[in-house]
């Protein structure tokens, strides 16, 4: 006997019981240990920060990161699942700064680096318990006890080894480049971090500035073009001519060094209001909408205008060139003259770009090889330094107003406006970033770019477009990676520099540091290693450079550092690298996926992972980003406590988010999965257990459902009922579909087969087989029904266990055989048995279901419920296989639709008349202006002619002398039902119902309504499925004649359907309560009692 099943189970409470079962029996640990001799399957888990609580963005990859390892484990693989924590970097530093009220780097240093790092260490894992509790509640199996932390000394040492390897391979260098810089965090960021913080719309001042031309550089293109030396004032070069340059960063004007022109852009010199300006021809209309307001003097391409000198707006010593930098340098290599650059565009502004090489990557490239010393006159918090004396100490963005005022006072302000544009912000503190020239240490990514592209080509991405799309394109444009940060709580960059000769060296281990310094350290953090000095060959000492590593470098090194490689696992590293599988969100194409790839290729010339599932972004239901401030989403823990984790998991993997698209989350989606999958599956299981207990059925002969499916094959050979063979075939299809999807790492194809299968099992197989379980005789057909339902339930549970682990465990615990493993997650995954698949039978049942669906649609249109019998259904099909299927399964069709007769016709025109209209979308391409005349001819086609076209015969029409070949796709066919018939067409099938209702049909429908009412009454009274009843039936006075007639005709049907031991035509006894059941023909009066 099975434990009785509550059909109204509390899934949330049940899931908590399963969690307790897993915990007490250590089922996860068993699942890993029992496969220890199996093939090793490597899974890398990207380390999250534990400084915040998990949210929906973590739930999507976490679900996938549970499904795949569960599946691989059931397939026999050894799959350790070690969790990890990202402990260093800006996230925790920013949090601690807020808590300690430290507002700048100077505040941190005043507080003390050692104390600050101690505060970071003590707080970095503050939400670990919440993470463990939440992910465990989701059903995710992962090893928290053996987790790795990026702040552990062994992890940090392996990261040092990685840095040393890059150093030895000449892939690490020190440089000075333009990088995005956070003034709040006072450190540079990598280009790949820009997308992590996102772009926000901001309003900035945009000004157009006059730069007055003074002369031309001898030998320059401009000198050749104008045949001028140093003078400016000829007819073609009027005095006081100005270039108009546009900028959205007025604060960079004190550092202006040049004006950039597009070499192929057409520029004009115009005269307007006795003034002369040079700007791009295509931008004239924006600045001068009235063309009569100016006169064009000449037009020239930018390449001919290089070398025109202009008067600088400011003369601050920011270029190391002396008091008058405008006269320094040879020809056009000097400052304050025009230069050509390919980055100049005419999408906005004037087509003339103000160049400040200390504040723009393109600007910096203009002067990269000019031999001019570029200085950045900003301090660590982006305030002007003494070089820009007038604005010293002022934050650059705050200086905009004063600088604009000064430009206006000088008469150089041509136009001022306010613009809104997208601007990058810091990914941790959300401050606007500043592009500025900074010192940093770089990984020479561009040297290995081709190898990275080759590695990417070997990776299986899901969705596949990521490989050559978002990730591949990012790799094509990959630039050297700035890995140093001017911060405190991080892994120190292990490079020492001599204070005297400047020699540098990289340390790759604690042992090497001990050998060089005599100090063996158990903590490698900044406040410790900064105290360690190393003797230099020159006789002086080497001190560590001050920077720490980008935390993304540490997460990219996790394949090696989590194993303490190469200090441990040096001989069996191939067992742990590369990963067979990883999964994270789309943003990690710029983050973890990228850093993993860089380091794996740099160290081993291979990818770090073989398969990657990329997920999209989970948005609130209104399409906005989920926000605590806006309160526009539910806590995911509350969702699980309302609907259960299984429903949430299946909802997520069925959504677009697993295809790297955005998901607008709504509780309704989870609720729908609960109603359409979880509850129906439970009902199927409940049905089996309930009737098996009634009949005393123990687990059938096929109880041991082994992975190879021999028992299923044996069962299939003994089944005669098509329904049994069909659901068995469909179960094997489910197994095959899920396995194929998971083998291909395409989780987007996992959910739909489950949804479809549960619907077929519950709403077709069990419903169509219900009478076989009801009957009192335990004959062969009944035994086959039990064996089949048991077998398919068990194989279904095994197949979907990785996806919905809770409900499958609950079912398994009750229906497993005595010699089965104690948990479904310790079992082998079922292997599809091709011999059991029956494609022909699946097609036949699909055809039956199509016809049933079409006929039900007709009933709905005519307001005819299925309990109302109908005389006949007419069917026409142009597919002989469909006709054969319907003939073979005619009894099922008639019973399902409550129709007395199934009539086949050869031609559709036997039940409908045709009318046709032109398909303008198709004909318009062929006939053009003659289409309307062809349409008139098509509307005059007879029903017989249209029938010929539908049967494949080609007709021809004469359209103004042109011969039109008329085929089915060129016409739109309307079907007009003949009298009393209602028809519907779908592809090769046409179905019609005779909706005429005779007295006998109406009476039989009334009896079916009566039976339905009695069944509902049994449920309301709490009667069991086997309880026999005493039934009294009567009717209202006005219906009594037809009611009694219906009762007499169908009394035996009433008895059989309601389990009535006694049935009487009589009024309800005095004192008893009557229930009234309404049908279209009769108002029934009913009372029941247990027999």
Swiss-Prot record:
Function: Catalyzes the attachment of isoleucine to tRNA(Ile). As IleRS can inadvertently accommodate and process structurally similar amino acids such as valine, to avoid such errors it has two additional distinct tRNA(Ile)-dependent editing activities. One activity is designated as 'pretransfer' editing and involves the hydrolysis of activated Val-AMP. The other activity is designated 'posttransfer' editing and involves deacylation of mischarged Val-tRNA(Ile).
The reaction(s) this protein catalyses: tRNA(Ile) + L-isoleucine + ATP = L-isoleucyl-tRNA(Ile) + AMP + diphosphate
Motif ('HIGH' region): 48-58
EC supergroup of this enzyme: ligase
Organism: Treponema pallidum (strain Nichols)
GO cellular component: cytoplasm
Description of its domains: IleRS has two distinct active sites: one for aminoacylation and one for editing. The misactivated valine is translocated from the active site to the editing site, which sterically excludes the correctly activated isoleucine. The single editing site contains two valyl binding pockets, one specific for each substrate (Val-AMP or Val-tRNA(Ile)).
Major subcellular site: cytoplasm
Molecular function per GO: aminoacyl-tRNA deacylase activity; ATP binding; isoleucine-tRNA ligase activity; tRNA binding; zinc ion binding
Entry keyword annotation includes Cytoplasm: yes
Keywords: Aminoacyl-tRNA synthetase, ATP-binding, Cytoplasm, Ligase, Metal-binding, Nucleotide-binding, Protein biosynthesis, Zinc
Binding site for ATP: 628
InterPro entries, per the entry: aa-tRNA-synth_Ia, Anticodon_Ile_ABEc, Ile-tRNA-ligase, Ile-tRNA-ligase_type2, M/V/L/I-tRNA-synth_anticd-bd, Rossmann-like_a/b/a_fold, tRNAsynth_Ia_anticodon-bd, Val/Leu/Ile-tRNA-synth_edit
Record-given protein name: Isoleucine--tRNA ligase
Cofactors (names): Zn(2+)
One of the GO biological process terms: isoleucyl-tRNA aminoacylation
E.C. designation(s): 6.1.1.5
Entry's localization field: Cytoplasm
Residue ranges annotated as motif 'KMSKS' region: 625-629
